[in-house]
A protein has these predicted regions:
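Signature of N-terminal electron-transfer/Fe-S-associated modules in redox systems
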Residues: 1-156
Length: 156
């Protein structure tokens, strides 16, 4: 049995400890916002937080989450009220949308660590997240917009 918390809800699962966290999140917990992209931690589509740090869930064994807090895109906000989600919508970031949950999760860590990031900070933090539609300029603009919202008290 592996016990951990997902989006502030306790999970106690009888799964192989080496099972990738991604498949536990999607198949056992039914949280499908986290996407499978490459399976080798190169694209960032599967990014979740473990104790507040961005982790590629496609290669992280579920045992890594034991006793910890996992946050998925569903845990960022269930009603799209998180400043990043609002900024993503306002800047019309998604095209196909497949990479967006991973992009948002990486951006959330960035803004927690650097509330007013520079373009260079954003580029460095988001390097591991690939968008095959090429929406990088809109992603950067949305992160700046979210930083502004948070600075004005828009954080939840």
């Amino acid at each position: 049995m592996i016990e951990f918390s997902v989006n502030k809800t306790r999970a106690n699962l009888d799964v192989d400890p080496s099972t990738p966290l991604l498949w536990v999140i999607r198949d056992h917990l039914g949280l499908t916002g986290t996407k499978y992209g490459c399976g080798i931690a190169q694209c960032g589509a599967c990014t979740v937080h473990i104790d507040g740090q961005a982790v590629r869930s496609c290669v992280a064994p579920v045992s890594r989450a034991a006793g910890k807090e996992v946050t998925t895109i569903e845990g960022l906000s269930s009603d799209l009220s998180h400043p990043l989600q609002r900024a993503w919508i306002e800047e019309d970031v998604p095209q196909c949308g497949y990479c967006q949950s991973g992009q948002l999760m990486s951006a959330a860590v960035l803004l927690r660590e650097k509330p007013q990031p520079t373009d260079d900070d954003i580029d460095k933090a988001m390097t591991g997240n690939i968008c095959r539609c090429g929406t990088y300029p809109r992603i950067r603009k949305a992160i700046h917009r979210a930083a502004g919202k948070i600075a004005m008290g828009g954080a939840r």
